[in-house]
Curated annotation (Swiss-Prot):
Keyword annotations of the record: Chloroplast, Plastid, Ribonucleoprotein, Ribosomal protein, RNA-binding, rRNA-binding
PANTHER family the record matches: 39S RIBOSOMAL PROTEIN L20 (PTHR10986)
Function: Binds directly to 23S ribosomal RNA and is necessary for the in vitro assembly process of the 50S ribosomal subunit. It is not involved in the protein synthesizing functions of that subunit.
Gene Ontology CC annotations of this record: chloroplast; ribonucleoprotein complex; ribosome
A GO biological-process term: translation
Primary subcellular site in the record, as a coarse category: plastid
NCBIfam families, A to Z: rplT_bact
Protein name in UniProt: Large ribosomal subunit protein bL20c
Protein source organism: Cyanidioschyzon merolae (strain NIES-3377 / 10D)
TM helices/strands, residue ranges: none
Annotated gene: rpl20
Length: 116
């Protein structure tokens, strides 16, 4: 049976980590670079989840600034009128097609009268 040497595999693994740590503080030693890379990968994983929340919050804030009355009442009116648009679509509609958004706003008012 031939003896298997793992030198190439280990070197490739270490080089991959060192390449990912390029530009980091203490990126020349494998042990320090490995800690930094693992921490950065955790932060980027967390950030991908937070980005969804942050954008939803941003769209809601911007829609609230555009609307003449509260955003929550507007969404409630849309649901009552069975208009299914998510927050991103509503915000893009308000930016790109203002007349269409005004018609949508008028439609939400006319079908069921808004109770303020």
């Amino acid at each position: 049976m031939v003896r298997i040497k793992r030198g190439n595999v280990a070197r490739k693994r270490r080089q991959k980590i060192l390449k990912a740590a390029k530009g980091f503080y203490a990126c020349t030693t494998f042990r320090a670079a490995n800690e930094r890379v693992m921490k950065s990968w955790k932060a980027s994983y967390r950030g991908r989840k937070l980005r969804k929340r942050d954008f939803r919050r941003l769209w809601i804030t911007r829609l609230n600034a555009i609307l003449p009355y509260k955003y929550s009442k507007f969404v409630h009116q849309l649901k009552q009128n069975q208009i299914a648009l998510n927050r991103k679509m509503l915000y893009q509609l308000s930016c790109l097609d203002q007349k269409g958004f005004e018609q949508l706003y008028g439609l939400s008012l006319t079908r069921n009268h808004l109770i303020c």
